Amino acid sequence: SIFTFSDPSAILNLTKNKYRKGISPMQINTVWAAYFSATDTTKKVVTQIARRLSQQLQCPMQTFDFTLKHVRKTPKAFAAGDLVVFGTPVYAGRVPNLLIKYVASIQGGGALAVPVVCYGNRNYDDALSELRLTLTAGGFHPVAGATFSCQHSFSLTQGAGRPDISDLTIATGFADQVCHKVEALPSAEACPPLLVKGNDPVGPYYTPRDRHGNPINILPVKPKTKDTCTQCGRCAKECPLEAIDPADAHNIVGKCMKCNRCVRHCPRHAKYFDDPNYLYHKTELEEQYTWPRKEPELFL
């Protein structure tokens, strides 16, 4: 079922078969908040959902933050009895292309999963479908899914301040619905296939275009550094791809995913982007997709 913020069915009646003879609710040992979150928006949504699930299911919560590259160098495996709220941002309508291989390498081990994608108020396109398919192939059992519109990583105005109190309240209610569904399951294997919006197989990445319809390529774009930089090394330490030279922040020595983590974390506000195509695309996004406000979508 698909629900939006305005759906009157706030709590689903999913427990009617819970006490049927021969069936007992499955045991959840640990709720996990697992996420890649360059600018902390996905982190906020996933943590809110996981914390509430932990409270409702009365089991411990652990965090698996794989934003930084050194974390992704170690294989990760979950197990039966885990309930993993698994969040990624949406880049170009998909799970980030520089991240999807790592996500595919994570072993579900029979754990339940709640795929969550956070996007910048344009569109999540096939991202949730892609994450669901990837987690399923990795041995997870997706039990529910959600999309949340958050502040765009490029912008200070597009989706500014989101997730806000309204979003996080919806996240809490969603967790309650997930809890009811989990409590009605006799086992993870009994979880029915999760239906979400998006194509299967997934479609191409979203391509930004100028007003004449010509494609804009921002893949080679890298951040610049102002003279106010003190070489504190914060940006190099925080870069999810370790693309910034720790000895000289002016040097970008690897691929950049335009996540803007370095821009947001620099204490001197010395990191910035000045590429004309990047700025054009940023302006187009702000002009076309700041409004109307898009609300969370919940899939159960």
Which residues does each PLM region occupy?
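FMN-binding flavodoxin-like domain, especially the glycine-rich phosphate-binding loop
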Residues: 14-68, 74-218, 274-300
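Short, charged low-complexity linear segments at domain edges
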Residues: 200-221, 230-246
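Iron-sulfur cluster-binding cysteine motifs and their immediate structural context
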Residues: 224-225, 230-257, 261-279
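Acidic, Ala/Val/Gly-enriched low-complexity intrinsically disordered segments
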Residues: 7-10
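Aromatic (phenylalanine/tyrosine) cluster motif
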Residues: 3-5, 19
